[in-house]
């Protein structure tokens, strides 16, 4: 008995006569290796459908090509190779290939003072695109930090001054008494409000960039902000964090400018956009600021 030939409906033509910008799959589970870690990722893979007579693409070919990403350390060269396989397997049908990876690798971060350290998650999206020889890669990275309101800090200082005036008016100042007062809740009657905040970085990588500079970008951004959220801490670390917040008072405008200046000096960035969100503890709404830049633009 002769085996039946399985039908390939995707090879059929259509009378619709309409090319499509993107056709593919979303949310494909995939293990990848980044920074020596095995990380669970989700992939969106697709190509353009430029032949207006073609009914569809061959999605299984895209799915199978993704297996190449499991073989070694994830970098831009292997991402480009996968995109090229997308196009090679759709010769005559597609001119553009797209791949997006969503993952959340862990970085071990040291405490500020003590020898402790702990793991911190960094939500990451990698967007890549290939058309002919034009390969583009963009990193979306989220950083979490603490922001203390400069206005609230000034108001708190004023209240402390007023209480000091009330408690010591007309009295000779004694060093020991003042020192004890400064260390008491009776003296420090107000503290500024602060909140956990987030910076969303979208960075276009330069053509000569090969590796994925996750740790470099995290270090660069957190150093610019000065108040990255911590992992394992002792009391000495918590005190150092309080000092860092006091020395890095920030409105959302201040935070986005710090990040903008830092990324402008990063040679592997060809362009970027930044969005910072301060989840206000004073208000029921967020404070937001944005900035963008492109190398060579006026």
Swiss-Prot record:
Domain of life: Bacteria
Pathway involvement of the protein, from the record: Cofactor biosynthesis; 7,8-dihydroneopterin triphosphate biosynthesis; 7,8-dihydroneopterin triphosphate from GTP: step 1/1
Residue numbers marked as site, May be catalytically important: 149
Top enzyme category: hydrolase
Entry-linked PANTHER family: GTP CYCLOHYDROLASE MPTA
Designated name of the protein: GTP cyclohydrolase FolE2
Family: Belongs to the GTP cyclohydrolase IV family.
GO biological process, one term: tetrahydrofolate biosynthetic process
A single MF term (Gene Ontology): GTP cyclohydrolase I activity
């Amino acid at each position: 008995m002769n085996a039946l030939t399985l039908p390939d409906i995707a090879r059929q033509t259509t009378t619709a006569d309409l090319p499509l910008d993107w056709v593919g799959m979303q949310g494909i589970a995939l293990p990848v290796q980044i920074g020596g870690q095995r990380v669970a990722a989700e992939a969106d893979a697709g190509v353009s459908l430029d032949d207006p007579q073609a009914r569809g693409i061959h999605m299984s070919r895209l799915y199978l090509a993704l297996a190449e990403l499991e073989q070694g350390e994830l970098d831009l060269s292997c991402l480009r190779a996968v995109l090229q396989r997308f196009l090679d397997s759709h010769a005559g049908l597609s001119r553009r290939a797209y791949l997006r990876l969503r993952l959340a690798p862990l970085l071990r971060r040291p405490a500020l003072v003590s020898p402790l350290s702990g793991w911190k998650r960094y939500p990451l999206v990698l967007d890549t695109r290939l058309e002919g020889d034009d390969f583009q890669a963009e990193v979306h990275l989220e950083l979490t930090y603490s922001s203390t309101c400069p206005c609230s800090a000034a108001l708190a200082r004023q209240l402390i001054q007023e209480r000091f005036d009330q408690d010591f008016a007309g009295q000779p100042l004694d060093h020991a008494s003042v020192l004890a007062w400064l260390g008491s809740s009776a003296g420090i009657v107000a503290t500024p409000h602060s909140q956990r905040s987030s910076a969303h970085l979208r960075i276009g990588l330069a053509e000569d960039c090969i590796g994925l500079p996750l740790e470099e970008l995290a270090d660069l951004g957190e150093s610019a902000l000065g108040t990255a959220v911590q992992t394992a801490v002792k009391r000495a670390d918590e005190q150092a964090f309080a000092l860092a917040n006091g020395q890095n008072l920030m409105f959302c405008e201040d935070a986005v400018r710090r990040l903008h200046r830092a990324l402008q000096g990063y040679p592997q960035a060809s362009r970027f956009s930044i969005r910072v969100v301060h989840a206000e503890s004073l208000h029921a709404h967020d404070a937001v600021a944005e900035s963008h830049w492109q190398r060579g633009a006026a």
